[in-house]
A protein has these predicted regions:
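N-terminal helix-turn-helix DNA-binding core of bacterial DNA-binding proteins
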Residues: 2-42, 48, 64-73
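Residue-identity detector for glycine
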Residues: 25, 37, 54, 62, ...
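C-terminal regulatory/oligomerization modules of transcriptional regulators
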Residues: 52, 71-121
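Beta-hairpin "wing" of winged helix-turn-helix
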Residues: 52-61, 68-69
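Hydrophobic alpha-helical membrane-insertion segments
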Residues: 20-24, 55, 106
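Compositionally biased, low-hydrophobicity segments enriched in charged and small polar residues
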Residues: 38-45, 58, 99, 103, ...
Length: 121
């Protein structure tokens, strides 16, 4: 993947937020909705954008589509995600996302990234 393509993917705040959360582990769309507070259609659109460019992978688990970072992400993506994690520590929006993810952690530990049983799924 070319560096320009990666930066095209990273130039949107929603995609940055998705990647930051995905850096913590795989999730389904309903989890992203709960964490980011954005509508399903917006999240799905951005996940599709990232997927077609190879920055996220998707796997069907029963009724759920579970998104994750690639098993072997490009070097440029790894470097930019490390920078994002570092910079996000001082950004209230990214901190809120991580706090919401932390609240979901017990549920995720019990059910995994798919099978949350929410009304959305």
């Amino acid at each position: 993947m070319e560096l320009v393509q990666i930066y095209e993917c990273l130039c949107d705040v929603t995609r940055l937020r998705l990647l930051q959360v995905l850096a913590q582990g795989p999730l389904c769309v309903c989890h992203f909705q709960a964490i980011l507070g954005e509508p399903q259609v917006k999240i799905s659109k951005h996940l599709a954008y990232l997927r077609t460019r190879g920055l996220v992978e998707v796997e069907r688990q029963g009724n759920w589509m579970v998104y994750a970072l690639p098993a072997k992400p490009p070097r440029e993506l790894r470097a930019n995600l490390a920078c994002l994690q570092d910079c996000a520590r001082e950004n209230p929006l990214f901190q809120r996302d991580l706090a919401r993810l932390k609240k979901l952690a017990p549920k995720l530990a019990a059910t995994g990234p798919a099978g949350c049983g929410c009304a959305t799924c």
